[in-house]
Swiss-Prot record:
A Gene Ontology cellular-component term: Gram-negative-bacterium-type cell wall
Name under which the protein is recorded: Na(+)-translocating NADH-quinone reductase subunit E
Family note: Belongs to the NqrDE/RnfAE family.
Localization per Swiss-Prot or TrEMBL: Cell inner membrane
Lineage: Bacteria, Pseudomonadati, Pseudomonadota, Gammaproteobacteria, Vibrionales
Keyword Acetylation on entry: no
Main location per the UniProt record: membrane
Length: 198
């Protein structure tokens, strides 16, 4: 149990997808203008990562891994296309659920919801799972923790950006300029966790 708590804390803070690996920056910067929208997208990313990482773990372990289907047959060259297909299917299902049950959130997320399919934070989580050889339970914990870490980062950035609307930002830094500086400072804050040994 201690191992799983350690993995959860590590994936949320120490190896934060957005602020340590800078994955998922497109949607991270574009949707982080309002806390409500950021929270909605963050929940969507948590759901997709929590489902995609363990599901792709099963696909990799029982179909693609060297010797999984037939001894001596390695289908790992199909990793990218298979993982993206699984992620795309999950995002499509999530999009239909949001459209049906949460129309305001669906409309607020707009084009960024289908872009979760190609969000490199999602694919990065799946790739790290394969690279680190996590088992099924570890992949559930890692997927959930990575999603929560990404959501924590985007909601924090959205809160800061909402407060910055009322700040006196120099004209040359308004918009993305001050946002990049803010993200850099947030990343420095999360970098302080890098020395933590769990």
């Amino acid at each position: 149990m201690e191992h799983y708590i350690s993995l959860l804390v590590k994936s949320i803070f120490i190896e934060n997808m957005a602020l340590s690996f800078f994955l998922g920056m497109c949607t991270f910067l574009a949707v982080s203008k309002k806390v409500k929208t950021s929270f909605g997208l963050g929940v969507a990313v948590v759901v997709v990562l929590t489902l995609a990482v363990p599901l792709n773990n099963l696909v990799y372990t029982y179909l693609l891994k060297d010797g999984a289907l037939v001894e001596g047959v390695d289908l790992s060259f199909l990793n990218f296309i298979t993982f993206i297909g699984v992620i795309a299917a999950l995002v499509q299902i999530l999009e239909m659920v949001l459209d049906r049950f949460f129309p305001p959130l669906y409309n607020a997320l707009g084009i960024f919801l289908p872009l979760i399919t190609v969000n490199c934070a999602i694919f990065g989580g799946v790739s790290f799972m394969v690279q680190r050889d996590y088992n099924f339970t570890e992949s559930i914990v890692y997927g959930f923790g990575s999603g929560v870490g990404w959501m924590l980062a985007i909601v924090a950035l959205a809160g800061i950006r909402e407060k910055m609307k009322y700040s006196d930002v120099p004209p040359g830094l308004r918009g993305l300029g001050i946002t990049f500086i803010t993200v850099g400072l947030m990343a420095l804050g999360f970098m302080s966790f890098s020395g933590v040994q769990l």
